[in-house]
């Protein structure tokens, strides 16, 4: 595994160049501000609206996506996956010129062929492994978050060096930047989200909650046992792995972990995980998601509404009112 650190990258390669950050959401605002603090000239390309005004208030030169691409030597695409292909076709593609670098923080659109850059530009990825607010906060504290780096197309012969310079400007070389490929990053990222981090965990939490409430236990107690305390366990794993978590819990809980976990996540579960991975590898999920967006997201919206109305959500909202230390966001935002 090749990992790059501060001494392996030269942010000076970006001096005299302009970086265009396309999109000013969670990653956009974090990466743009970190780059600026590292002495890099940054412009923000967004359409008129809330993000435009926020970027302007943050002191950036804000312009249309087309103008930003024409202005910059490095173009970082930080729009949501489902918006990138349309914006690329409409405002980016015709404004690209020889020797520019097209950057991404997720490989979805390149790997699944939704964006096909011309052969005369570099195409690379710098993917911080943290949500934007942490990318920014940790940088301001003098540290950095780990990242992945990949080169899809090296037209200039310097793509990796420029990508590492960008990673250093964002602060990621302070922690370490691991070399990967667009394929590996995309497929593992989607699998982790679907089978473990999002799909797997939410299904497990709901199933546990429903099992207890259907067994006659009060919803409030079920919420505490199946969702609220999850953060305590995940924090222990985050800090020191499974061994640290098991060292920190009671022996009763640890024994229950060993004898029961494999009854819940069974061999059949793992077989289904492999089927999910195959669907991702073969592009079936990507096709499904692309078609869903083209159709106006009917399935997505229906499932989202149903999930928001689950009893677990209603109970949780009431219980969190008792917890003054939890600062629930007034407005839900994409991290």
Swiss-Prot record:
InterPro entries: 6-PGluconate_DH-like_C_sf, KARI, KARI_C, KARI_N, KARI_prok, NAD(P)-bd_dom_sf. NADP(+) binds at residues 24-27, 47, 51, 81-84, 132. Substrate binds at residue 250. PROSITE patterns: KARI_C, KARI_N. Mg(2+) 2 binds at residues 189, 225, 229. It catalyses: (2R)-2,3-dihydroxy-3-methylbutanoate + NADP(+) = (2S)-2-acetolactate + NADPH + H(+); (2R,3R)-2,3-dihydroxy-3-methylpentanoate + NADP(+) = (S)-2-ethyl-2-hydroxy-3-oxobutanoate + NADPH + H(+). Its EC number is 1.1.1.86. Residues 181-326 form the KARI C-terminal knotted domain. GO terms for molecular function: ketol-acid reductoisomerase activity; magnesium ion binding; NADP binding. Pathway: Amino-acid biosynthesis; L-isoleucine biosynthesis; L-isoleucine from 2-oxobutanoate: step 2/4; Amino-acid biosynthesis; L-valine biosynthesis; L-valine from pyruvate: step 2/4. Binds 2 magnesium ions per subunit. Mg(2+) 1 binds at residues 189, 193. Pfam families: KARI_C, KARI_N. GO terms for cellular component: cytosol. Its cofactor is Mg(2+). The active site is at 106. SUPFAM superfamilies: 6-phosphogluconate dehydrogenase C-terminal domain-like, NAD(P)-binding Rossmann-fold domains. GO terms for biological process: isoleucine biosynthetic process; L-valine biosynthetic process. Keywords: Amino-acid biosynthesis, Branched-chain amino acid biosynthesis, Magnesium, Metal-binding, NADP, Oxidoreductase. Residues 1-180 form the KARI N-terminal Rossmann domain. It comes from the Bacteria. Belongs to the ketol-acid reductoisomerase family. Involved in the biosynthesis of branched-chain amino acids (BCAA). Catalyzes an alkyl-migration followed by a ketol-acid reduction of (S)-2-acetolactate (S2AL) to yield (R)-2,3-dihydroxy-isovalerate. In the isomerase reaction, S2AL is rearranged via a Mg-dependent methyl migration to produce 3-hydroxy-3-methyl-2-ketobutyrate (HMKB). In the reductase reaction, this 2-ketoacid undergoes a metal-dependent reduction by NADPH to yield (R)-2,3-dihydroxy-isovalerate. This is Ketol-acid reductoisomerase (NADP(+)) 2. It comes from Bacillus thuringiensis subsp. konkukian (strain 97-27).
